[in-house]
Amino acid sequence: MNGDLNSWDKFCNYLWFDKKLNIWLDISKINFTSKEINNLEDKFVDVFSSMKELENGAISNIDENRQVGHYWLRNPSISPSSKIAEEIRADINAISEFGKQILNGDIKNKNNKQYTDVLWIGIGGSGLGPLLITESLQKCSRGLNFSYIDNVDPFLISEKLEELSEKLSTTLFVVVSKSGGTPEPRIAMEIIKSHCEKNSLEWNSNAIAITMKDSKLFKKATSEYWLKIFNLQDWVGGRTSITSSVGLLPLALINENISEFIKGASLMDEATRISDFKNNPAALLSSAWYLTGDGTGKRDMVVLPYRDRLQVFSKYLQQLVMESLGKKFNRNGEVVNQGISVFGNKGSTDQHAYVQQLRDGIDNFFCIFIELLDTPSTNIFDDKENPKEYLSGFLQGTRSALSSENRQSITITLEKLNCFSLGALIALFERAVSFYAELVNINAYDQPGVEAGKKAAANIIEYQQKVSNLLDAGGEYSINDITSLFDNSVSESIFFILREMCFGNDNYLVKGDWSNPNSLVIQKLNS
């Protein structure tokens, strides 16, 4: 056995298939030898042991002193207490029942009209997970129509409100925030709530919260008598929340099968729990990442699903992989700067874009092809060229063209895309990320870089208020004048704040040239 990317023996030896899941995994086009992958088996003894401890309830998110329990969501019986198991089952039943009541009209708005739409407010995994669910699984004219606000872009918020203007009274407003303190969903929520109140539209009776018990959002939703509150456990992280209420509520509201989604994830969890290294798909997948990047993440992951419905999956993996694996320090406190960069879109579209560079340019990546074998049950393709055959041909052709230049790839094949297979696919990558983190000795479940960004943003927001108050009080100020009052190290930030606040705003008199920040003198005019 050698690293030959086109070896039939290697393909046969490392092809994984599970007949319960009907999923194939092929890592043969990763450049490794049998000796190299066999050397990882000893490492996986500790990897499997660590995963067992995590599932048994060990504190795995050290920074926040929290357990990591998304695996319990798919199989409550493995959770560390009967109380947790009962809560998980109760949450699933509550969401399933609520979805049925909304869709069949048992729950209507204050005007006795059936709900038609959902405006989903959440950021990170709280937005990407639901978006993946609806984009991948929602069928035409089935369930409620979904719109998303996953940012505080003022144009996004105004456009969504305009799009829904005639249907806001029959729109469910779902706000997702575990703590209730995340600025982006809080700000979007307040803007939309205010808009509804100004236009004599219902907010409270149309609003749903997904949050932790006793969080700021929980208390707000309770005191204002929102329509519903669903639980988001403190041991569920945003990037692994798709099998919690965050992912199950969208499934219920588009009339898809929650049980099948959970079953697919649970069966993949079983397949990735076994200690037989070469028959564990997540062990094979994470080993391929490790070997192709020399354990340092030196190759980017390019995700190419050959099905439009999975286009969001690339973005979903971008967060799951990069937020979990992008770490400065390992568990020993040593600087390692780990991580795998992820990008992608869909095939065959990308064959007419960056695949040119993948084949002929810098060799700093590996591809993950995702293939589906099913065809729509329709007669529109009778006696015509079958697009499925062309799509498959484009995938195989791209894979072959890359390997001919020794460019590496992994191929995952699903029989069909449905709730069951999507749940399984997500669970496969969740476990592979965990395994890879163990291989390189980092914590996959903290996010100090994200927290640092939040703190820095909070500082800027504080400076914005200080600058606004200063200008409101009257007088002319240069950037140097302002920084001398606050902090001489933030001149660049003050420039950005003034530009955002004053450029093109007739309420401010600006002297000087914006291309020369030191020349600027700014005064607020009397209104």
Curated annotation (Swiss-Prot):
Annotated GO biological process: gluconeogenesis; glucose 6-phosphate metabolic process; glycolytic process
Subcellular location field: Cytoplasm
InterPro entries: G6P_Isomerase, Phosphoglucose_isomerase_CS, SIS_dom_sf, SIS_PGI_1, SIS_PGI_2
EC number of this enzyme: 5.3.1.9
Protein known as: Glucose-6-phosphate isomerase
Species of origin: Prochlorococcus marinus (strain MIT 9301)
Main location: cytoplasm
Pathway listed: Carbohydrate biosynthesis; gluconeogenesis; Carbohydrate degradation; glycolysis; D-glyceraldehyde 3-phosphate and glycerone phosphate from D-glucose: step 2/4
